[in-house]
UniProtKB/Swiss-Prot annotation:
One of its GO terms (molecular function) is pyridoxal phosphate binding. Pfam families: Aminotran_3. Keywords: Cytoplasm, Isomerase, Porphyrin biosynthesis, Pyridoxal phosphate. Its EC number is 5.4.3.8. It is an enzyme of class 5 (isomerase). Its cofactor is pyridoxal 5'-phosphate. This is Glutamate-1-semialdehyde 2,1-aminomutase. It comes from Chlamydia caviae (strain ATCC VR-813 / DSM 19441 / 03DC25 / GPIC). It catalyses: (S)-4-amino-5-oxopentanoate = 5-aminolevulinate. The lineage of its organism: Bacteria, Pseudomonadati, Chlamydiota, Chlamydiia, Chlamydiales. It is found in: Cytoplasm. One of its GO terms (cellular component) is cytoplasm.
Amino acid sequence: MPVIDETPMTYTEACRYFPGGVNSPIRACIPVGIVPPIVSSASRDVFIDSFGKNFIDFCGSWGSLIHGHSHPKILDALCSAASQGTSYGLTSENEISLATTLFSCLGLQDHKLRFVSSGTEAAMTSVRLACGVTQRSVMIKFLGCYHGHADVLLKGMTIDENNLMEVPHLVDRYFSSDPCLPLTLILPYNDLKTFEEVMEKIGERVACVIFEPIAINMGVVLPEAGWIESIITTCRRYGALSIMDEVVTGFRMGSRGMRSILDVTPDITVYGKILGGGMPVAAVLAHQSIMEHLMPVGTVFQAGTLSGNPIAMAAGQASIELCQERDFYPKLENLTEGFLSPIEDFIRCKGFPIALVRAGSMFSFFFRETPPRNLRDVQECDQKTFGIFYRHAFSRGVYLSPASMEASFISSVHSRENLAYTQNVLIDSLVKTFEGI
């Protein structure tokens, strides 16, 4: 009889096989100074590590799990789809079903989409598509916004004065005539004046402007009034395409996302996370006049062996159907409000220098007096003190997203019991952090 090794798998063992012990860098939890847990299993709002310790999960696979871990409807869909084949390399019924559900949910006509396997892939495809449609090669993004790890999109994630290029320098020396090689220009987030000045000078050379309607990867940083609307309007004025990255906000901020909340119509929208129900699914969506520039109809290349994977499509179908259930978002809003309001009141009462910023069921603790409006503000936060606060909470089984520049998330299945426990833990952790008790 074989001997079964029941020794818990550890982070040290993971480091033997993976750089930094992880397959995505933030999972190493370096910003908060903890040894990252190795997950054994997860259900609803809790995961269990390899030592058998329970953690209440407020990361939720970085916002993907709005329905929590191991939702029965999603698991049933996965098992049923897997029994019919794991991958076809052909268009499947599941792809058509999910697309039908999406267009019905979003209330869109005359649009088409392309399924891919990650937010990075979707954002990368959207930029390539915009360059092909416009035959231009300058892309604008905003400092601190994250759109995946493609080379042209990864710039501008930290403050670097050399990245904030002078416009004449850009035009005279760096403009490329090859639409397949976009040049990235990085501008400050929430700075409409600078954006409009740049567009006035080079707008006719800009292929696209990509933006998050709510910045998530520097923590939850809210757009100022009129910011998103002005981006889209200005793009139209100069013939550039606007790309709204709803990888995180899509189906998190309501069934129709930020395009409905803000009443805007970007040229291209990118979805992911919740769209896959925990499986690798993302999508690029636009009016058919734009989407038909993609091969095989047009000339802009995009391909993927696992794009539209039938198992992932089934999980996505179940996830979106759950989002469409009656009162799903009002209930989630009430759950989040009831959880965060007492913590916010406590912070205000004690006068702690913390801005607790919330958007829907997403939230961030910024260790500064006022909510940040851009990356520079975020980087002025007290990261060291945040780490102390985080470690106090983590030691008592509360797992927030492990960096001050990341959002945490509430799921629809967070129990009131676990939320009440977490309230007490977070309040106690704040007291220990600031008063040394």
